[in-house]
Amino acid sequence: MSKKKSNSGLRFQPAGGNRTPQVPVGKKQRLDIERLAGDGRGIAFLDGRTWFVSGALAGEAVEARVLNARGKVVEARLERLLQAAPERREAPCRYYDRCGGCNLQHLPHEAQLALKQRTLAEQLQRVAGVQPEAWAAPLSGPEFGYRRRARVAVRWDVKARQLEVGFRAEASQDIIAIDDCAVLVQPLQSILRHLPTVLRSLSKPQALGHVELFSGTAEAVLVRHVAPLPAEDQARLQAFCEQANAQLWLQGEGEPAPVDPAAQLGFALAPWQLELAWRPGDFVQVNAQVNTAMIEQALAWLAPQADERVLDLFCGLGNFALPLARQAREVVAVEGVQAMVDRAAANARNNNVHNARFFQADLSQPLAGTGWAAEGFSAVLLDPPRDGAFEVVQGIARLKARRLVYVSCNPATLARDAQVLVGQGYRLKRAGILDMFPQTAHVEAMALFEAG
């Protein structure tokens, strides 16, 4: 059946009425950037839409290319700088405009810290309706040369019949060939510089998955492989690692294992004369200097006395529990993963720490019903993952702790949990950022709560 043409000039609209047409991907648009979002992108407003522009700073006029548009939100990338902000700097890294590892190198370090502090303050105010009674100065270390672990992407290009080695591009699976990374600690920079050559020299590069680099009490290279490595390739990798004074670890279908069974990875906590052993796959803070400063601040805020019992929730390998045990009468440390509990307990034994007890518990559930939770504590330390500690803090007042330090890698969940703690009678005494990841917008924070 034929349809008559309409002469009204109106286009057909789907059910729901008139809709604003979407901004096409790839379109270039001139924008005036008004402020920075918490993730470091510039924010602009145009035609009723909010634009998020990566690489742009507040006060700049830019030409941006649309990457994605949905509803009233447009994501874009800086294409051309029309008017630069006075604080803009030339990114120190020559790969910065392509690599996805860093996103704030164009912003001076002091301004990065101010952005992170503002992000934390806004989350606390917006979500919890609170501000700390006092702000702590940001905990920060070197802005470059701080990262003690890295994951190197590896992919066999079937068409070109060559191995790609490097870091992922921003929001992409593309691999950027990089032989120098300014945020890595020096020993890993040296390994990274020569790694692509040795990987491409292997007889079966198609067998490679990805490679991880670690630095601590020793350096290590972990090679993940999706098919068995020929003996000659393993020997070549071993020779490379020996020349780099690094351990070689391999991982096929099972757990990572060192080629030398006696090899161990560890990191030192010098102020407490501790050395913690760990394995690839375990959570370890990437920034050694800020990690030490973070522990020192947590202990200063908690101020555990020699006659007090302290609870450490989400204890991991014992990063906080063992230093706490140097000051408190007893530390009870709890972690959700049994393998981590076992390693934390082993770390305590190996460091002659005898006043710390370790337990496994599902910390996504309330604490009620656990024997160790019924014992009572003077102070509590929480260091949860990004999801926060919502279930745990629901009934934390029953522990009768006077002081509580919350270490967070997500200001949004910290603010959510702070609202619960304030509702239970705790006061937010102090808060501040931990600059664990300079040159990125990632915010870590610490907050001190006191009862009554």
From Swiss-Prot:
Q: Does the keyword DNA-binding apply?
A: no
Give the record's keywords alphabetically. 4Fe-4S, Iron, Iron-sulfur, Metal-binding, Methyltransferase, rRNA processing, S-adenosyl-L-methionine, Transferase
**Which InterPro entries does this UniProt record tie to the protein?**
23S_rRNA_MeTrfase_RlmD (IPR001566), MeTrfase_TrmA_AS (IPR030390), MeTrfase_TrmA_CS (IPR030391), NA-bd_OB-fold (IPR012340), SAM-dependent_MTases_sf (IPR029063), TRAM_dom (IPR002792), U5_MeTrfase_fam (IPR010280)
- Record-linked Pfam families: TRAM, tRNA_U5-meth_tr
Tell me the residue numbers annotated for binding S-adenosyl-L-methionine. Q285, F314, N319, E335, D362, D383
Which reactions is this enzyme annotated as catalysing? Answer: uridine(1939) in 23S rRNA + S-adenosyl-L-methionine = 5-methyluridine(1939) in 23S rRNA + S-adenosyl-L-homocysteine + H(+)
- Record-linked CDD domains: AdoMet_MTases
The signal peptide here is none
**GO molecular function list:** 4 iron, 4 sulfur cluster binding; iron ion binding; RNA binding; rRNA (uridine-C5-)-methyltransferase activity
- EC number(s) given by UniProt: 2.1.1.190
> What SUPFAM superfamilies does its record include?
Nucleic acid-binding proteins (SSF50249), S-adenosyl-L-methionine-dependent methyltransferases (SSF53335)
Domain TRAM per the UniProt entry, residue ranges: 22-80
Binding-site list for [4Fe-4S] cluster: C93, C99, C102, C181
The answer to whether UniProt assigns keyword S-adenosyl-L-methionine to this entry is yes
- Note the superkingdom of the native organism: Bacteria
Q: Where are the transmembrane segments?
A: none
Residues at the catalytic site: C409 (nucleophile)
Question: Which biological process annotations from GO are given for this protein?
Answer: rRNA base methylation
Q: Where is this region: Disordered?
A: 1-25
Q: What HAMAP family does the database record attribute to this sequence? A: 23SrRNA_methyltr_RlmD
Please give the function described in this protein's UniProt entry: Catalyzes the formation of 5-methyl-uridine at position 1939 (m5U1939) in 23S rRNA.
The record's family statement is: Belongs to the class I-like SAM-binding methyltransferase superfamily. RNA M5U methyltransferase family. RlmD subfamily.
Q: What is this protein called?
A: 23S rRNA (uracil(1939)-C(5))-methyltransferase RlmD
Organism whose genome encodes this protein = Pseudomonas putida (strain ATCC 47054 / DSM 6125 / CFBP 8728 / NCIMB 11950 / KT2440)
